[in-house]
Amino acid sequence: MALKPTMSQLLKNYDLERLAISTVASHTALQILRGAKKYGFRTIAVARGEAVAQFYRQFPFIDEVWVGDFANFRKTAEKLAANNAVFIPHGSYVEYVGWRQALEAPVPTLGCRELLRWEADQFKKMSLLEKAGIPIPRIYKTAEEVEGPVIVKLFGAKGGRGYFVARDRRELAERLKRVTEDYIIQEYLFGVPAYYHYFSSPVYSRLEIFGADIRYESNVDGRTFGWAEPTFVVVGNLPMVLRESLLPTIYTYGVQFLKAVEEAVGCKLAGPFCLESIIKDDMSIVVFEFSGRIVAGTNIYMGYGSPYSVLYFDKPMDMGERIAHEIKEAVKRGKIEHLFT
């Protein structure tokens, strides 16, 4: 990766005793910054406008709240680097600044930054899952190929906005006439949606299953009484504890995904990521999406910890705390460059 030497050199100039953790004031910022403060780091939130900034200023664990320039995020990133800050990406960051700016932002960024480019393209995302040997839904290139119910998804981190389902090729062809953005057509899967939270740890040289959630989507999960068109805009998340017999498969998929990222994308993924799936009634798991960074579903155990974190640390820990723990231990062990790109 072209960016890695630059970020590596930048980190060498950091005062690691005064490290700050920063993120965009949205999505999982409260969880991330609360965890960072609990582990003794300075904290910075970058807000999209003064009204948002005012909300985040009420929290004592956030040391500084800035109003950022998201149209030209490079300036904000340079200011973060000048303040000895590392950056934690999440879905709102990707949506606000776009993957191109995110790739070029001159601030050490947790995880595999190049993976953001792949996340922006639904076809590349599915090809990566396929390379990992993970079961995926059938993908259709045109409406004429469709043989049953499908779901149409727009590119990018949009929280389900603009997604729709169609029962057959005729309905699909009609509805696609109104779509003006890039999209992918996937086989519609029947079963239970489940979103798996993982943490890839360079410090401990292991992959951790950290939690799971179900998304609550409007208005497919709302009170529509059959009067409204199903939509998939995410409004919140519900906790989920998985059948223990499913965990080995879920863990294996995570391992396979990490290997595929390293081989295809060219960098090792450190920190949180998510595989998004349907569990069918025969207990098979089909993965239809991934997020190569922290997901909002981890907010379900903010403050009291993931039910799976006790398996690794013998104490409850939420994902914000887990990120901070990894960074603190990486500083102690001289492995900080393994976390950031």
Curated annotation (Swiss-Prot):
Keywords: ATP-binding, Ligase, Magnesium, Manganese, Metal-binding, Nucleotide-binding, Purine biosynthesis. ATP binds at residues 143-195, 217. It catalyses: 5-amino-1-(5-phospho-beta-D-ribosyl)imidazole-4-carboxamide + formate + ATP = 5-formamido-1-(5-phospho-D-ribosyl)imidazole-4-carboxamide + ADP + phosphate. Its cofactor is Mg(2+); Mn(2+). Residues 113-328 form the ATP-grasp domain. This is 5-formaminoimidazole-4-carboxamide-1-(beta)-D-ribofuranosyl 5'-monophosphate synthetase. Gene3D superfamilies: 3.40.50.20, ATP-grasp fold, A domain, ATP-grasp fold, B domain. The gene is purP. 5-amino-1-(5-phospho-beta-D-ribosyl)imidazole-4-carboxamide binds at H27, S92, N237. GO terms for biological process: 'de novo' IMP biosynthetic process. InterPro entries: ATP-grasp, ATP_grasp_subdomain_1, IMP_biosynth_PurP, IMP_biosynth_PurP_C, IMP_biosynth_PurP_N, PreATP-grasp_dom_sf. Belongs to the phosphohexose mutase family. HAMAP family: IMP_biosynth_PurP. Mg(2+) binds at E276, E289. Binds 1 Mg(2+) or Mn(2+) ion per subunit. Its EC number is 6.3.4.23. It holds the Pfam family DUF1246. PROSITE patterns: ATP_GRASP. Pathway: Purine metabolism; IMP biosynthesis via de novo pathway; 5-formamido-1-(5-phospho-D-ribosyl)imidazole-4-carboxamide from 5-amino-1-(5-phospho-D-ribosyl)imidazole-4-carboxamide (formate route): step 1/1.
